[in-house]
Amino acid sequence: MDIKKKIRRKIELYNFKRNHRGLYVDGSLQLRLPKYISCGSNIAIGENSKLLCWDSYNGKKFETSPSIIIESGVRITRNLTIQCANRVQIGDNVLIASDVFIIDYNHGNSPLTKNYRDNPLNISVGGVTIENGVWIGNNVIILPNVTIGEKSIVGAGSVVTKSIPAYSVAVGNPAHVIKHFDFEANIWIED
């Protein structure tokens, strides 16, 4: 990375932290188009994390702007990557473990183009919503058009391809619900 890019990145990170009081971020946080990122208070984002917004691809501007929203009390361990061309919303008091990848769009896959890079991004598939109090385990991948319901747990190594109801435990590739919380018995019950 050349010196101009390093300086620009430091200034961008400084301004981002200044505009979001109560935000702790490691100096290695990478931002792309931070004007599309909003954060609540009392948030910690660990080292080597990336919040990347895309408002165009291959020189074509999208009709809508991307949006990453991180609510208050969120804790992110390290190595989180969010790729956003639509909308990613993370609710209050969410815990995200290491090496999590969240993406809200699909890449085109037509073999009729010269190469896959020339395919347009499909941003109409739907965003990602992680509701309040969710716990995301290590090495989880969250794909577009899903909602992870309030106080749910996603087990380590899971790939979330469809929505997960509130107060559930989901694991696997693809992730599937294995438990739900029974409020009458006050325990987790296997499905």
Report residues per predicted region.
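A generic "structured core" feature
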Residues: 135, 151-153, 158-159
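Mobile, glycine-enriched helix-loop/loop "lid" segments at the mouths of ligand-binding/catalytic clefts
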Residues: 109-118, 186-190
